């Protein structure tokens, strides 16, 4: 099991098949018209990322956001990041209809994100660094590993930089700083970015680059 390999490829290797994961494997007959022009969001209870700018997204796009998921997930999200509209769904097909009808999906590694991937819909994914197994690189998807995010929705442009701690650990790589309270998080952020870019260094080598600041 290789770090950064997605779950679909792991299952395919076990089953000795070679699916074309670049093409959609889910479809929706009637996308939900209610989510047209909106951003569908979701955040499950597990698999959270580091420094993902949820609060800034809510502040900038609150009126355009529609949350799908469990009621308790919506409650937790609003408690942490601000109130957003909730769209009740009776099953995962209704979640798929909501995502398919929207302009964009933003979410962490959860079932709505898996549905979005199956649809190959425009996506911004909050990546979990200790379970980095939902990596599907495509032109209309961003994998956010350390909070840096830029995108456009309607007439608005959004740009966010990670809110790193004032003191902690860091790795400087290609003139970019990866900062965190714990050294292993610096390594994890860099390691994830290298996988997305097609590069590779050993964990031991990256550990040697960590310094205090």
What residues fall within each predicted segment?
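Catalytic machinery of carbohydrate-active enzymes
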Residues: 1-213
């Amino acid at each position: 099991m290789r770090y950064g390999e997605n779950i679909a490829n792991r299952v395919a290797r076990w089953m000795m098949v070679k699916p074309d994961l670049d093409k959609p494997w889910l479809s929706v007959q009637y996308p939900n018209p209610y989510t047209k022009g909106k951003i569908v969001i979701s955040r499950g209870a597990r698999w959270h990322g580091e420094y993902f700018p949820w609060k800034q997204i809510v502040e900038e796009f609150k009126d355009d956001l529609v949350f799908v998921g469990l009621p308790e997930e919506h409650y937790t999200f609003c408690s942490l990041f601000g109130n957003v509209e909730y769209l009740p769904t009776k099953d995962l097909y209704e979640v798929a209809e909501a995502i398919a009808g929207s302009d964009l999906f933003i979410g962490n590694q959860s079932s709505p994100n898996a549905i979005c991937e199956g649809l190959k819909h425009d996506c911004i994914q909050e990546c979990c660094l200790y379970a980095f197994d939902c990596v599907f690189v495509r032109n209309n998807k961003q994998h956010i590993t350390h909070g840096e995010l830029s995108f456009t929705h309607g007439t608005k442009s959004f740009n966010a930089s990670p809110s790193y701690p004032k003191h902690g650990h860091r790795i400087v790589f290609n003139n970019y700083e990866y900062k965190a309270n714990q050294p292993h998080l610096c390594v994890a952020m860099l390691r994830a970015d290298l996988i997305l870019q097609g590069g590779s260094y050993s964990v031991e080598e990256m550990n040697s680059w960590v310094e205090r600041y």
